[in-house]
């Protein structure tokens, strides 16, 4: 009992503070919180792309109904197979992470994170592996599940997760690696892209493609074993050759006359409103 009392006075107040901060952050959030500044594309009258404006991130936002079914199935199968059953936290996973924390003397070596926790970490928190960040992440995941639907959480996650090489979100990754919209991805390509976020360096498609392929194969196997796809679909997808496009070269000139004119016209229209 004495140890419990000492433990509460040592960590209890800190935990309650983290819970309060987590609740406040989620309460203040809205759908716009999960929408980064998007990449803008300018087309001519014939529908041909003229220009693409982007900041530090290459970002496109897709609504839930626009997300490919294969991508959703792939990410759930490998990252959070109990996604539709939990309320933000997988307590078995947390228990494993807690045991690992004790065994490794205060170092966090296992995540045990659900997709909702990963969303909280990506949008609201830093990447530091400390117990405070982990506790806050857990509280935020619970609050996110109270405020948003499972479909919204998937939408937010797949539009914010990092796919290496400056691509944030599934649409940017699909365009960057395959030069196609996410809706046109094959099952194999969807699984391939879903392999990246776990570790964007190790599974970088351009520098470590073999690693990405191995994880793609694991994801496809998980999808088959979880009865998300048929055997013939699995066999076709695992034998499909993945062809990754090279990075597009950015223009060296800052602004040509077309870009300057587009910005000028857009500014005039905004000023009228």
PLM region spans:
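Solvent-exposed coil/turn segments that connect beta secondary-structure elements
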Residues: 45-48, 55-56, 67-70, 78-81, ...
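N-terminal type II signal-anchor transmembrane helix
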Residues: 1-45, 50, 102
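Flexible, acidic/glycine-enriched loop-and-adjacent beta/alpha segments
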Residues: 63-115, 171
